[in-house]
């Protein structure tokens, strides 16, 4: 009945708040763990090729094809791909500047993201470890631009990265992958609750 809908909505809002708190704690755990990593300090440019790929316009996106990564993660699909292997990419333009994504194999990455390509440095760095390391990094200090926020290549090249041995990196990557899996599951559940909240709000005013 309509009288119970407000209580159902309040329950949904409470569950959303709990999930958001849990997600924040999980992300904080990754940051805390990365701050306690010990190893050699190297510049990011010493272990990765850093570049912006060719941009395609939104009108070129297709319903089928290969995933396209832009300023907001996955933004659509395209008939071709410009990276055969999975890649780390950092949003370098707009309000999501500094967001780190790990792409699927055979994807197109646009010029709104900076690629951190470690394919030629596999003996030095574990790609998944570096992804988690950068995901825990606060990029605010290198974001520039008074109108549209942006990250340019030079300060990225000079980022100091702490690298344990390659075997330790792989071990840590496994642990952080489990944390990431928990974040991803919570994110999906959170989206379901948000959808439920929006539905209940609409129903209350019918």
Model-inferred region functions:
Residues 2-70, 158, 163-166, 189-190, ...:
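Non-catalytic DNA-recognition/assembly elements of restriction-modification systems
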Residues 171-181:
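Extracellular/lumenal glycan-associated surfaces
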Residues 28, 32, 178, 185, ...:
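PAS-family sensory domains
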Residues 23, 148-150, 169, 196, ...:
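Glutamine-centric residue-chemistry signal
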Residues 1-13, 34-37, 115-124, 136-141, ...:
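Proline-centric
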Residues 49, 132-139:
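Short, intrinsically disordered, mixed-charge
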Residues 70-135, 144-147, 152-156:
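A short beta-sheet element
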């Amino acid at each position: 009945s309509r009288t119970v809908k407000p209580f159902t909505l309040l329950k949904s809002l409470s569950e959303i708040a709990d999930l958001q708190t849990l997600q924040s704690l999980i992300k904080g755990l990754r940051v805390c763990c990365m701050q306690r990593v010990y190893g050699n300090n190297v510049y990011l440019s010493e272990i990765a090729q850093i570049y912006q790929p060719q941009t395609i316009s939104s009108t070129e996106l297709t319903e089928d094809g290969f995933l396209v990564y832009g300023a907001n993660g996955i933004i659509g699909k395209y008939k071709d791909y410009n990276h055969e292997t999975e890649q780390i990419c950092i949003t370098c333009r707009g309000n999501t500047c500094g967001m780190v994504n790990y792409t699927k194999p055979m994807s197109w990455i646009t010029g709104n993201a900076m690629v951190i390509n470690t394919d030629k440095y596999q003996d030095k760095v574990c790609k998944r470890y570096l992804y988690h390391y950068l995901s825990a990094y606060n990029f605010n200090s290198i974001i520039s631009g008074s109108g549209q926020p942006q990250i340019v290549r030079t300060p990225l090249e000079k980022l100091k990265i702490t690298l344990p041995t390659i075997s330790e990196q792989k071990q840590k990557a496994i642990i952080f992958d489990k944390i990431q899996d928990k974040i991803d599951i919570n994110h999906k559940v959170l989206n379901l609750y948000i959808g439920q909240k929006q539905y209940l709000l609409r129903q209350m005013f019918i």
